[in-house]
């Protein structure tokens, strides 16, 4: 058989292999959060936007929450402001919050929307301040003394009307990670992972997918071959207790479990540095990253 025909048959087989997933997930909501160094490579971002457009065309309902930490640090440096962190939280002065808001909702978000539309998608940008309700975080040092970290908050609620309206029109919402402070209505800088989990608790998507710059949960963080493909909520907590999961992955895991407890079916952690990582996770039996599930296998 001609080699070209063979390749075409193989491509057709891949499409047919996706049939069970297309049948299972059509008209279902997927909440996709991406950030980290994966956002620094424009080629990867464009490929990801194209893949999400494909999901939209196939009848899925994607919702995107994006990050932008490195772009914020760059914008602050250009403005002569030093990036400082306390307990992993970016210190955000009143002067800095305007830069954060301008970078996230005024630069990154419209750029992603334009990429999405360039591939034929029907995306709409929504500032996080129209979705997330926040309260200010009050940090303390080791002696218990208060530390002022500025305009930084936790998400305590979500206003989902704009998102549900967009989904009803088969338009993909693309949301920036900012919250409006309860009472004052001032913008607050919030963790994008935790914001995505809070939104997932309200929307209850079939999947909450975190796309970052790590392959997933690994027994040895320096060895990708130790990737753990699937864990339950209890097993994930055990990985934190025994030290397998540490650092920045801990709040991600806790937020994932909160989402599962609220009704999300599965949470996935995948590597955004790999082309088509999202499609491989959704449309193949074994996936490419780590999934956290509610039920025992």
UniProtKB/Swiss-Prot annotation:
Pathway recorded for this protein: Amino-acid biosynthesis; L-arginine biosynthesis; N(2)-acetyl-L-ornithine from L-glutamate: step 2/4
Domain of life: Bacteria
A molecular-function term among this protein's GO annotations: ATP binding
A single cellular component GO annotation: cytoplasm
Enzyme class per UniProt: transferase
Designated name of the protein: Acetylglutamate kinase
Family: Belongs to the acetylglutamate kinase family. ArgB subfamily.
InterPro entries: AceGlu_kinase-like_sf (IPR036393), AcgluKinase_fam (IPR004662), ArgB (IPR037528), Asp/Glu/Uridylate_kinase (IPR001048)
Binding site for substrate: 68-69, 90, 189
SUPFAM superfamilies: Carbamate kinase-like
Record site: Transition state stabilizer: 33, 252
UniProtKB keywords: Amino-acid biosynthesis, Arginine biosynthesis, ATP-binding, Cytoplasm, Kinase, Nucleotide-binding, Transferase
EC number(s) on file: 2.7.2.8
HAMAP family noted in UniProt: ArgB
Record NCBIfam families: argB
Major site of localization recorded for this protein: cytoplasm
Entry function: Catalyzes the ATP-dependent phosphorylation of N-acetyl-L-glutamate.
Any matching Pfam family: AA_kinase
């Amino acid at each position: 058989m001609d080699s070209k025909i063979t390749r075409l048959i193989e491509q057709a087989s891949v499409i047919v292999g996706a049939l069970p997933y297309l049948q299972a997930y059509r008209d279902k909501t997927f909440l996709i959060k991406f950030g980290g160094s994966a956002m620094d490579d424009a080629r990867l971002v464009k490929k990801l936007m194209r893949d999400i457009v494909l999901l939209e065309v196939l009848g899925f309902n994607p919702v995107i929450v994006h990050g932008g930490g490195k772009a914020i640090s760059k914008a602050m440096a250009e403005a002569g402001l030093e990036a400082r962190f306390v307990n992993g939280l970016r210190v955000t002065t009143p002067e800095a919050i305007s830069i954060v808001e301008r970078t996230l909702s005024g630069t990154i978000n419209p750029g992603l929307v334009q990429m999405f539309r360039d591939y034929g998608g029907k995306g709409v940008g929504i500032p996080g301040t129209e979705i997330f309700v926040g309260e200010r975080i009050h940090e303390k040092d080791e002696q218990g003394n208060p530390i002022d970290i500025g305009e930084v908050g936790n998400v305590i609620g979500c206003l989902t009307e704009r998102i549900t309206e967009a989904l009803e029109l088969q338009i993909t919402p693309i949301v920036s990670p900012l919250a409006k402070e309860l009472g004052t209505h001032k913008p607050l800088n919030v963790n994008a992972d935790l914001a995505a989990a809070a939104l997932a608790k309200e929307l209850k998507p079939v999947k909450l997918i975190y796309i970052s710059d790590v392959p997933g949960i690994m027994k040895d963080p320096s060895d990708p071959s130790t990737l753990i493909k699937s864990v339950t909520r209890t097993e994930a907590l055990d990985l934190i207790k025994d030290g397998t999961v540490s650092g920045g992955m801990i709040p991600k895991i806790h937020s994932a479990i909160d989402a599962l407890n609220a009704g999300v079916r599965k949470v996935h952690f995948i590597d955004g540095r790999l082309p088509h990582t999202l499609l491989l996770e959704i449309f193949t039996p074994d996936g490419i990253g780590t999934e956290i599930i509610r039920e025992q296998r």
